[in-house]
């Protein structure tokens, strides 16, 4: 890889035409003879060849940072997304992450900051595919991911694990997720599915359609997404009239909502909405991480929601035990004690 100064010069040059030190790893893993190089196909359909085990990782995306933690790769991170202090899981699991250099967000990558860290592997959301081209021209390996369904989340876990020689850890993680998904499906096999409206982070009148990851969470929790007819792959704006026509049994606020349950309950436009009339308005917890995002821990979002929708079938004790098991196993802290 080119030296630091050369990287910065090259990045600046490419940008004009295209529009911290690493933590010590907790466990580098063992490299089997002949394991590398590995060839992967990322979520952009690109073939990526990893010649040797990456030792310096960059993630500008909370979702992939959380995955790297679950795969015991956070010790190899040299740069992460902006404002990490907003993610409680970093402080709970590995406070040293808060000291790493910032490299941008899921929408905008700071190319110079990223290149200055001389990473071996950069993991980006699919929307930053133009940045991937620039970084690869500088000699860095880049994986583009888009975990907007349960299947794509599984693919992302397997892809990153293979790239970083963590396949056995990924197997344990996916085994846990599969086991808990089966537990939910069995517990909720014969339930009547109440209708659910999931509102967005910045705007109450935005929601997740059928092709978004959050729709999978609602289904797994034994609910019916009232916005299932929407096929947009990002948050869709609706009107009060549409929401009242749907008349959901439950209103669920996204974990990072900028408004409160009380705001919704006191909204004069919603006085006749069934969820408001019956007090069935709840906000997804965010005291560890955003379970309504496609992170490995999103299974806990489905578990929490199932407890809200079907409290007679899933008790608080059951949910807390599973949450503690997950975080103790993959993040080394006890959820119920935070």
Give each language-model segment a name.
Residues 1-5:
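Positively charged n-region of N-terminal signal peptides that target proteins for export
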Residues 8-16:
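Bacterial N-terminal signal peptides
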Residues 17-29:
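Bacterial lipoprotein signal-peptidase II cleavage site
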Residues 32, 37, 47-49, 130-206, ...:
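Extracytoplasmic substrate-binding proteins
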Residues 59-117, 121-127, 226:
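A short, structured surface patch at a secondary-structure boundary
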Residues 103-106, 110-124, 140, 239-256:
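Proline-aspartate-enriched helix->loop->beta-strand connector
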Residues 128-137, 254-268:
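A ligand-binding cleft/hinge motif common to bilobed small-molecule-binding domains
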Residues 207-235, 239:
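Alpha-helical, coiled-coil/dimerization segments enriched in small aliphatic residues
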């Amino acid at each position: 890889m080119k030296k630091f100064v050369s990287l910065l010069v090259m990045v600046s040059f490419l940008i004009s035409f295209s529009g911290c030190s690493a933590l010590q790893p907790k466990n580098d893993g063992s490299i089997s003879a002949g394991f590398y190089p590995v060839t992967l196909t990322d979520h952009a359909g690109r073939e990526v060849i990893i010649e040797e085990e990456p030792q310096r990782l960059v993630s500008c995306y909370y979702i992939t940072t959380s995955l790297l933690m679950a795969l015991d790769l956070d010790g190899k991170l040299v740069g992460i997304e902006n404002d990490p202090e907003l993610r409680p899981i970093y402080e709970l699991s590995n406070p040293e992450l808060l000291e790493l250099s910032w490299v941008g967000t899921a929408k905008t990558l700071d190319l110079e900051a990223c290149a200055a860290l001389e990473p071996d592997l950069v993991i980006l959301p699919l929307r930053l595919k133009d940045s991937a081209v620039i970084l690869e021209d500088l000699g860095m390996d880049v994986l583009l991911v888009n975990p907007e369904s349960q299947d794509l989340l599984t693919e992302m876990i397997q892809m990153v694990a293979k790239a970083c020689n963590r396949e056995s850890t990924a197997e344990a993680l996916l085994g846990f997720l599969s086991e808990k998904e089966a537990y939910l499906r069995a517990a909720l096999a014969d339930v009547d599915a109440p209708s659910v409206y999931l509102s967005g982070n910045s705007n109450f009148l935005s929601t997740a359609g059928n092709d978004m990851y959050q729709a999978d969470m609602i289904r797994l929790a034994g609910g019916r997404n009232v916005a299932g007819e929407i096929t947009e792959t990002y948050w869709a704006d609706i009107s009060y009239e549409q929401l009242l026509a749907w008349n959901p049994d439950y209103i669920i606020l996204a974990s990072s909502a900028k408004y409160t349950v009380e705001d919704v309950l006191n909204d004069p436009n919603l006085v006749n909405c069934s969820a408001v009339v019956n007090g069935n308005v709840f906000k997804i917890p965010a005291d560890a991480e955003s379970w309504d995002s496609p992170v490995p821990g999103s299974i806990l979002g489905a578990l929490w929601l199932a407890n809200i929708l079907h409290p007679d079938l899933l008790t608080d004790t059951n949910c807390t035990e599973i949450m503690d098991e997950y975080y103790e196993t993959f993040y080394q802290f006890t959820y119920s004690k935070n």
